[in-house]
Regions:
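Compositionally biased terminal segments of proteins
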Residues: 1-270
Length: 270
């Protein structure tokens, strides 16, 4: 069996795991930080360094939230293989069924050492703990007016894995693609140079078992991925942008055909 590819975000992920240790049995990692956990092909392009730690958290049987697209502030390091994206915040998705449950969740966050961010221009959902900045967003758009529709089923279907001696829950690859596609259309505004699209391509390229996993996924998820992949494959802007999300050496550029072939298979699965 080939060794797993190197995960440049492992140190960042471990630091967040330790900070969230009391909640590890109730959280699931999602978003950019999960990319390195989903890439299994050592021949794929290196995973980009994101500085983000994305997790879904359940504080009680009816309350959950996800730390999505989160970023721990670190000094930039320029690896030769891929650029570094250093942001400064962690976005969290809240699976609270009501505003009252959101209030309870906020109290729990204070108990974990987080506090509301009072900086000018900070969104209402922002929390901080040391260098960790957390945007706590709901899965129910009625609570604060925004969400990603795939976070709730992603939490319900999270899988277990181990890292640094800790057992953690991670979003599955099919739901990872769905959440990233939703973000690509939303915050990404269909920008073909976005990090959401980059993460999508990285997982499609680096996970040979993806097509079989989608085949076993719920019908609504299969259809969504099929429709979205079909739309991308018919878009000249996407086809032109694809090589730019791979390394520029000849071997990496040849993997563009692998990505397109795998996406075509996902279209057929729907």
């Amino acid at each position: 069996m080939s060794p797993a590819p190197e995960n440049p975000n492992e140190e960042l992920l471990l630091s967040a795991v330790k900070k969230l240790a009391p909640l590890l049995n109730r959280i699931a990692f999602v978003g950019g930080c999960a990319t390195g956990l989903l890439v299994t092909d050592p021949g794929a392009a290196p995973v980009r360094t994101t500085f983000d730690v994305d997790v879904i958290v359940e504080l009680a049987s009816t309350v959950g939230f996800a730390l999505a697209d989160g970023y721990l502030r670190q000094e930039e390091v320029q690896p030769s293989a891929a650029p570094i994206r250093a942001t400064g915040d962690v976005d969290a998705i809240v699976g609270a069924a009501s505003y009252g449950e959101l209030i309870k969740l906020e109290e729990a966050m204070r108990g974990l050492g987080f506090r509301e961010c009072v900086e000018e221009g900070a969104p209402r959902c922002r929390w901080v703990s040391g260098d960790l900045i957390l945007d706590l967003m709901p899965t129910d758009p009625a609570i604060l007016g925004f969400s990603n529709r795939w976070y709730r089923p992603a939490l319900e279907n999270a899988q277990k894995t181990r890292i640094g001696g800790y057992e953690i829950r991670v979003i599955t690859a099919p739901y990872f693609l769905a959440t990233k596609l939703e973000a690509f259309h939303g915050r990404g505004k269909n920008d073909f140079s976005s990090h959401d699209l980059e993460d999508i391509i990285t997982v499609v390229d680096g996970r040979p078992e993806l097509v079989d996993e989608v085949r076993l996924a719920p019908a609504d998820l299969q259809k969504y991925l099929s429709d979205e992949c079909g739309t991308l494959l018919s878009n000249r802007e996407f086809l032109d942008a694809l090589p730019g999300h791979l390394l520029f050496d000849a071997a990496s550029q040849q993997r563009a055909d692998l990505v397109l072939g795998r996406m075509n298979q996902l279209v057929l699965k729907g």
